[in-house]
């Protein structure tokens, strides 16, 4: 799969040396963490870089950054063939606050979905935090729909969403 699929931004795998830039991007997005506590820390960012669901290997994970020059504009955590073969799981997607509301996040997701389709993925899946209307609206705008499932997580729950490719 071609990971540098964005026409507008340079995409590359993120590493530990990018942790401060990732943390800065996350810290700008206080609203997300209102529904998904706790706030990101450098330690949690470093953990996320390599976190894998059961049964998956590092070869299945792509933790990508999208850059405008040296500026990190968006972060995407993608797991291929999870939770089943042919499904791409978007574990995390966040854009820099300064670019929100301008269609940039939707454009990146559109480019990602086109690339996943070319790679023979059949569907994309993700989960939003229950009670987060902004996240739910963003993903619905991008063609995702709630599956009807709910997975409890602390005092809240994750609501899976899917989109056929």
Describe the role of every protein-language-model region:
Residues 1-2, 155-165:
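Terminal substrate-recognition subdomain of acyl/acetyltransferases
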Residues 4-9, 13-19, 24-98, 109-111, ...:
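Acetyl-CoA-dependent GNAT
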Residues 96-98, 102, 130-131:
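Active-site acidic-Proline motif in GNAT/NAT acetyltransferases
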Residues 106:
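Residues forming the Rossmann-fold NAD(P)(H) cofactor-binding site
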Residues 117-127:
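Conserved GNAT acetyl-CoA-binding A-motif
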Residues 126-136, 152-156:
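Conserved beta-strand-loop-alpha-helix junction that forms the acyl-donor binding cleft
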Residues 140-149:
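Conserved acetyl-CoA-binding loop of GNAT-fold acetyltransferases
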């Amino acid at each position: 799969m071609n990971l540098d699929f964005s026409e507008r931004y340079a995409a590359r795998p993120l590493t530990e040396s990018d942790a401060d830039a990732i943390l800065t991007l996350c810290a700008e997005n206080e609203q997300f963490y209102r529904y998904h506590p706790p706030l990101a820390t450098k330690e949690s960012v470093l953990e996320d870089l390599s976190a894998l669901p059961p049964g998956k290997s590092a070869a299945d994970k792509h933790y990508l950054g999208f850059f405008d020059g040296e500026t990190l504009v968006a972060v995407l955590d993608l797991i291929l063939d999870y939770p089943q073969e042919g499904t791409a799981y978007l574990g995390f997607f966040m854009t820099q606050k300064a670019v929100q509301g301008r269609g940039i996040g939707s454009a990146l997701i559109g480019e990602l979905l086109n690339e996943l389709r070319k790679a023979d993925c059949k569907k994309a899946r993700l989960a939003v935090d229950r009670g987060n209307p902004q996240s739910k609206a963003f993903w619905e705008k991008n063609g995702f729909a709630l599956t009807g499932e709910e997975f409890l997580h602390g005092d809240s729950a994750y609501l899976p969403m899917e989109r056929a490719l």
